[in-house]
Amino acid sequence: MAFSKRVYRSLPFELVEEILKKTPAESLNRFKSTCKQWYGIITSKRFMYNHLDHSPERFIRIDDHKTVQIMDPMTGIFSDSPVPDVFRSPHSFASMVHCDGLMLCICSDSSYERTREANLAVWNPVTKKIKWIEPLDSYYETDYFGIGYDNTCRENYKIVRFSGPMSFDDTECEIYEFKSDSWRTLDTKYWDVYTQCRGVSVKGNMYWIADTKEKFILRFDFSMETFKNVCVCPPIGCTGRLGCFSGDRLPLLLQDTDFGGEEEVSTDIAVWLTNKLSDEVVSFTKYFNVTSPHLPLLQCHGDMARPGYFIGDHKNILAWCEGEVEEDDKWYTCITLYQIDQCGIRKQIETGRHRSFRYLDPFICSYVYVPSLIPVPE
């Protein structure tokens, strides 16, 4: 290490910064103690955001409330670590939303009752920091949450919460600002969000599929603190999955299923894509189809995990998901990384396998995630 320090001290500052910019966030977190120069670079806000904007996407997977797995989808290599103790019962995961390497964790108390407990947290898996968010009054199990930031100041992170269709109360919409550590109530109409589709945070704003007479993309602008109907969705049918493409576009993955006996059978995949979300008029166009037998189910089904996937630049899909196989009268859950293009499955790597006790419905979910050193806002 002493030799390494002497070498890097002799390098120009700009070159050291460029080398560190290409280093994974997990390694940078350890390198902060190497020397004062590195610490100064790594902890500067300008560097942290520059590093974040040039970092590749990963999959993050929570396995039955016990293990956090983070995978590089290009290599299939993944690391795992225990789920933080504070996210074990009674504060177990229900869902998450990603923004700038920060995970907004919506936790469950396994009831549909109002709760005044802090069941909402922001977590950075790299730095291991966690902040619990106390409710203004109470949270409800069917509330919708999103995380983003004011585009005039990226460090000004905010959380939006609005009531779902089972709240039985007047429509509630609240916004939490980390800078003031407080909630405010917003005056807004009721929104019926499509519950089968997760919301995504893109460029500081939240996007959901919402439903009135037809399904459309609903945006919450954290700068203006307003909702907006962005564009109409293509016919979704039973399922639809939103994601992020090239940092400023929304892909929509559609895949319906047939039932073969008691099992769900995957059918063809259609991927639609918006133009840039900053354009004056936003709309979906068909990006590509996948017509092939034996495709994996890229949606939540039965007691399997919610799969993680993202759309590549070459009309391809990378997906990390589960399937069941039967061997010697025993059922096993296989976790598999798929590379899929328009011709079908190009490559698949089994990354794990364990005994499956059917219908016990374990909690397992996957998300697209970018590791970062962005500090959890205080």
From Swiss-Prot:
<dbReference type="InterPro" id="IPR017451">
    <property type="entry name" value="F-box-assoc_interact_dom"/>
</dbReference>
<dbReference type="Pfam" id="PF07734">
    <property type="entry name" value="FBA_1"/>
</dbReference>
<feature type="domain" description="F-box">
    <location>
        <begin position="5"/>
        <end position="52"/>
    </location>
</feature>
<protein>
    <recommendedName>
        <fullName>Putative F-box only protein 15</fullName>
    </recommendedName>
</protein>
<dbReference type="InterPro" id="IPR006527">
    <property type="entry name" value="F-box-assoc_dom_typ1"/>
</dbReference>
<dbReference type="InterPro" id="IPR011043">
    <property type="entry name" value="Gal_Oxase/kelch_b-propeller"/>
</dbReference>
<dbReference type="InterPro" id="IPR001810">
    <property type="entry name" value="F-box_dom"/>
</dbReference>
<dbReference type="InterPro" id="IPR036047">
    <property type="entry name" value="F-box-like_dom_sf"/>
</dbReference>
<dbReference type="InterPro" id="IPR050796">
    <property type="entry name" value="SCF_F-box_component"/>
</dbReference>
<dbReference type="Pfam" id="PF00646">
    <property type="entry name" value="F-box"/>
</dbReference>
